[in-house]
Amino acid sequence: MALRRPMVAGNWKMNGNSALAEELFKKFATKLQNDSAEVVLCPPSIYLESVRQLLEANKQTLDGALVRMGAQNLSQHDFGAYTGEISGQMLKDSGCRYVIIGHSERRRMYGETSNIVAEKFAAAQKYGLTPILCVGESGPAREARRTFEVIAEELDIVIEKNGTMAFDNAIIAYEPLWAVGTGKSATPEQAQEVHAFIRSRLSEVSPFIGENIRILYGGSVTPSNAADIFAQPDVDGGLIGGASLNSSEFLSLCTIAMSA
């Protein structure tokens, strides 16, 4: 069985400020003492520099811990007249290692199709960023027993456009749309069932990737349910929304992941 290091990625969405980042790093210094889990902060782009400076300033106190920086989105284009967009090259230059791709809110609110998501996936890897690819089904799709079908389609378009080996440097986040921001989480058994399907699907085209890729769960994860979810054999941590804005809750989730 592969030894996959758990990851806890905090997606602040359009929330937070420099003070939140400073508060988190103060707690990181005393609570994160080893590298048994990887922690990723994904603040709004305007705060990336603040987080980068804090990473640099706390390098010694965080010695031994794995704290990285990620972005919430990027353009599929390299450069040009795309007002308000940020390229993969810019994110890499800012110090990002990761970038969230295809979050359900981007797909739903901003019309990002699976084709666009696949292009953004490629753009991230072109500049040495590791994409955190979000996949997941809506409530009606789950009720219609189409969960696996929807997720297979979202994975297959990325494979079709980028090749199977693109997942050798990628993270997948399963985020059931009916659980995102609703306070209603999937049960540990539901999460495991879908994560196992994702791993099996990728194993069909590459057993190595299927075994080694990290798959996060995202959808109303809290300190009260994280231990049971993270304990599932195919769950490798979480993509955290609301709880990432509370430094105590987020640190609790990191600690839980370290012992999962």
Swiss-Prot record:
Enzyme nomenclature, EC number: 5.3.1.1
Keywords: Cytoplasm, Gluconeogenesis, Glycolysis, Isomerase
GO terms classed as biological process: gluconeogenesis; glyceraldehyde-3-phosphate biosynthetic process; glycerol catabolic process; glycolytic process
Pathway: Carbohydrate biosynthesis; gluconeogenesis; Carbohydrate degradation; glycolysis; D-glyceraldehyde 3-phosphate from glycerone phosphate: step 1/1
Taxonomic source organism: Shewanella frigidimarina (strain NCIMB 400)
Subunit structure: Homodimer.
Protein name from the UniProt record: Triosephosphate isomerase
Gene (name only): tpiA
GO CC entries: cytosol
Annotated compartments: Cytoplasm
